[in-house]
């Protein structure tokens, strides 16, 4: 019988964790446990239904200061700065307001990053960022946010927009005018290669990604220096300072739709400022490390972005830049260097930048999907000390697929998922609309979760104060949290405002708010799915859901959510602590129980 169809008594890769009841306490209806991970001396106090702390990260502790900076920089400096200036300038209407928007994006990232950092101070030994923070901020209804975030993470775990930009700039390296399907084919091939680079070794993948990050920074610095050369009048560009005179001319022509669209492009361009928070359990002393180096990465990118925009505007007339689409950088190189081979080489460097961005996105998504997978629904019945295995389904089905790091020490399941969904998006959406639609679709649900997370920060503060828990190592200023909440509300509400040209005058060839409805539909589908399996099915079939802490291969710790018949709830509660760990070690076999001696909280009982 295949291992995934066997009862747990016949499986060799799962064990039930045991507990000595240390570090447990209650706050009303909520039960909390305190655990320490291998990356920090700070205790992670979390609501007991959350995925357990991994005391020794199976992914290692290879994320140091250099990697923190470069994994964020690599994700931010990808396709945004080369592909969004046209839409941002068009939306804001003027050069001056465009620069204000880039600064607004930087301030928003600081405010949002402060929220991430305070949550990390509360849960320093949990990777996955948003899924952990939402799980702990809103533990009731049980598993609601892990479920909805897990499903939307899977549905939105694609990088097709970056892949399309990669393909576009690769074709710019040649003289060929590609067809729609040629762009799709190269985009899919590029994304596949990026996935393969990450599959075989985590440490070497980080090294390779760091190397690309250095190249990306140097490329942007070269563009900036070239821009200053243009401003100095040392090229054939005529009147390079023309765009900076009357910098706010045209601001009055900006519409509400255009300003909202510009803000979406800004948010997309800074996407990745929080990427290292996904790897918190792989970072030693995560709060101080992320505070220093994530902020350094964000500030570095902000400065580079501002000067890069100066470079674009020094060589490309305003009207020409507004209509350049995704290829502002190619236009810049063409105006400065002509049609020389150097232009093709620089286009390749931008394609390499997009490739590095794809890798960084895959790394962050894989950690979030893995964290979602560590809270998995297992349809199992506990009857008279006999565990009858039926099948597995739920929050994210098939625990080993999501959380296992075999055979290469990398999360193959999440990598495959991101590749499969990206391939579908690349092939399904017209390449001309793919970048705008996908980038907008990713921002809208993200804004909803960021809003919930910022509000949830106040909920966590209130609960911890009431429970008399220690003060966190870092606490965000109120003004930053409030600013973050207001911007997220703006991002959620304003996309409904139509463009001036009518329903089909947006930045895609179809209805302007398609991405809004799609994003809301995804969120509603997640909520309906949760209600079905968490409430309707248990009510119809007469059981309750309870989580059990298990240990999988390589020490990976996860939660199995079991179906326990109502008449056996008392037995379950008597044999498990609030975190789902066995209070005593009882081996469950198909023919009857076998008692073994109790163990400490670090021991395991085979099931």
Predicted stretch roles:
Residues 150-164, 270, 274-282, 341-398, ...:
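Membrane-helix boundary/coupling elements in multi-pass transport proteins
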Residues 59-63, 70-73, 81-178, 297-300:
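Extracellular loop-to-transmembrane helix junctions
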Residues 21, 29, 57-59, 102, ...:
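Helix-loop-helix junctions that connect adjacent transmembrane segments
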């Amino acid at each position: 019988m295949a291992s995934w169809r066997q009862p747990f008594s016949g499986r060799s890769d799962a064990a039930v964790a045991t507990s000595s009841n240390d570090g447990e306490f209650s706050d009303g209806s909520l039960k909390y446990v305190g655990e320490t991970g291998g990356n920090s001396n700070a205790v992670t106090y979390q609501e007991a239904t959350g995925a357990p702390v991994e005391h020794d990260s199976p992914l290692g502790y290879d994320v140091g200061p250099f990697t923190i900076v470069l994994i964020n920089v690599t994700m931010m400096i990808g396709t945004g700065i080369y592909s969004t200036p046209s839409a941002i300038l068009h939306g804001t209407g003027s050069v001056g307001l465009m620069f204000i928007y880039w600064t607004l994006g930087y301030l928003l990232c600081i405010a949002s990053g402060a929220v991430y950092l305070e949550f990390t101070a509360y849960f320093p030994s949990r990777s996955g960022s948003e899924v952990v923070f939402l799980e702990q901020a809103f533990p009731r209804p049980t598993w609601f946010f892990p479920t909805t975030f897990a499903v939307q993470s899977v549905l939105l775990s694609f990088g097709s927009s970056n892949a399309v930009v990669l393909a576009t700039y690769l074709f710019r390296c040649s003289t060929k005018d590609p067809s729609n399907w040629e762009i799709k084919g190269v985009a899919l091939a590029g994304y596949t290669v990026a996935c393969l680079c990450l599959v075989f070794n985590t440490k070497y993948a980080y090294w390779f990604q760091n190397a690309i990050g250095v190249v990306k920074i140097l490329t942007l610095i070269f563009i900036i220096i070239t821009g200053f050369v243009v401003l100095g009048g040392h090229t054939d560009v005529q009147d390079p300072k023309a765009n900076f005179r009357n910098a706010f001319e045209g601001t009055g022509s900006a519409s509400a739709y255009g300003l909202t669209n510009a803000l979406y492009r800004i948010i997309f361009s800074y996407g990745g400022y929080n990427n290292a928070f996904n790897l918190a359990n792989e970072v030693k002393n995560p709060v101080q490390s992320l505070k220093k180096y994530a902020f350094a990465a964000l500030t570095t990118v902000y400065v580079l972005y501002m000067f890069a925009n100066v470079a674009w505007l020094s060589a490309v007339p305003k009207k020409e830049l507004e209509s350049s689409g995704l290829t502002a950088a190619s236009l810049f190189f063409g105006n400065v260097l002509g049609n020389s081979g150097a232009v093709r080489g620089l286009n390749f460097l931008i394609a390499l930048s997009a490739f590095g961005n794809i890798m960084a996105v895959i790394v962050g998504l894989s950690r979030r999907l893995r964290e979602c997978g560590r809270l998995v629904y297992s349809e199992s019945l506990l009857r008279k000390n006999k565990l009858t295995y039926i099948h597995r389904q739920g929050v994210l089905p098939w625990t080993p697929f999501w959380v296992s790091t075999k055979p290469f020490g990398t999360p193959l399941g999440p990598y495959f998922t991101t590749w499969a969904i990206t391939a579908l998006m690349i092939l399904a959406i017209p390449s001309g609309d793919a970048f705008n639609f996908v980038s907008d679709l990713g921002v809208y649900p993200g804004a909803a979760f960021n809003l919930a997370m910022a509000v949830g920060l106040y909920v966590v503060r209130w609960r911890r104060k009431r429970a008399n828990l220690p003060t966190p190592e870092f606490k965000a200023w109120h003004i930053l949290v409030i600013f973050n909440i207001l911007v997220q509300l703006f991002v959620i509400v304003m996309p409904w405002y139509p463009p001036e040209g009518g329903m089909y005058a947006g930045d895609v060839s179809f209805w302007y708010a398609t991405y809004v409805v799609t994003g809301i539909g995804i969120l509603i589908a997640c909520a309906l799915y949760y209600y079905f399996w968490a409430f309707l099915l248990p009510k119809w079939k007469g059981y309750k859901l309870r989580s059990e802490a298990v240990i999988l291969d390589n020490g990976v710790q996860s939660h199995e959510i079991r179906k326990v018949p109502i008449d056996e709830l008392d037995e379950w509660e008597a044999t498990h602590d609030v975190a789902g760990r066995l209070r005593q070690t009882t081996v469950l076999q198909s023919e009857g129980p076998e008692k073994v001696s109790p163990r400490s909280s670090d021991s395991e009982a085979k099931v």
